Regions:
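Assembly/interface hotspot detector across virion components, adhesins/toxins, and nucleic-acid enzymes
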Residues: 125-127, 180
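Internal alpha-helical scaffold/solenoid segments in large eukaryotic proteins
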Residues: 116-119
Length: 214
């Protein structure tokens, strides 16, 4: 199955997510209601990725699935959702357990394991195509991350004053027990939560002064 340029848009109210191309190679076992994917590839301005895995079709009584549950393994990912970054951010790969409901559209991720520079970011959440637009609710956690990588992954348009202060005033820090949350509702600015523990902090404490360690 090969598709040219198009967009994911569950309804007229949702902002379309465009893609340049997509393709998939798969086999289907109707007795088990299972699809085995040897390849799923997507190229778009939001990102590029290649995956493999399997999916189980649910609610086939009408001859068309109401939902599917899937487990996928994803190779290297280059991501830039909604143009949040100056260029694509590259990750080593990922694995995911997910459920896709078609009407109304809802993508639920039970466990998304994103590998990045020897660490693993675990995400879960749901994206819904509502009658008034996209709704997103995502939570994540990570054991540790280098502070410079945190700033690379923190979009400059989200909490820009906090991000700038950290970038300009934190000279060194060891981060652990990172928690992340993103909530988005139609017509409202996204709400970002970031929590973490830290040690070995070194920071500027006045505009023209020295530094303090903690």
């Amino acid at each position: 199955l090969q598709i040219g340029a198009g967009a994911l848009r569950p309804n007229a109210a949702t902002v379309p997510i465009p893609f340049r191309s997509a393709r998939s190679y798969f086999t289907y076992d109707p007795k088990r209601g299972q699809i085995d994917f040897s390849e799923i590839s997507v190229e778009s301005d939001w990102g590029t990725a290649r995956a493999e895995g399997r999916a189980r079709l649910l609610g086939m009584e009408s001859g068309w699935p109401a939902a599917l549950e899937a487990q996928v393994r994803i190779g290297e990912i280059a991501a830039n959702p909604a143009g949040l970054y100056p260029g694509p951010v590259v990750f080593e790969g990922a694995g995911a357990d997910l459920r896709l409901e078609l009407d109304p559209f809802a993508l639920t991720v039970g466990d998304f394991r994103l590998r990045d520079r020897g660490e693993v970011l675990r995400l879960s959440g749901v994206a819904r195509g509502q009658a008034d637009g996209w709704s997103v609710d995502v939570s994540g956690r990570m054991e540790t991350i280098a502070p410079e990588r945190l700033l690379e992954l923190w979009p400059v348009t989200i909490k820009p004053k906090t991000r700038t202060w950290i970038d300009e005033n934190v000279l060194g820090i060891a981060l652990h027990d990172i928690q992340f949350g993103l909530r988005g509702e139609p017509g409202r600015a996204p709400d970002l939560f970031l929590g973490f523990g830290f040690s070995d902090l070194s920071t500027v404490y006045v505009d023209h002064g020295g530094a303090v360690a903690a």
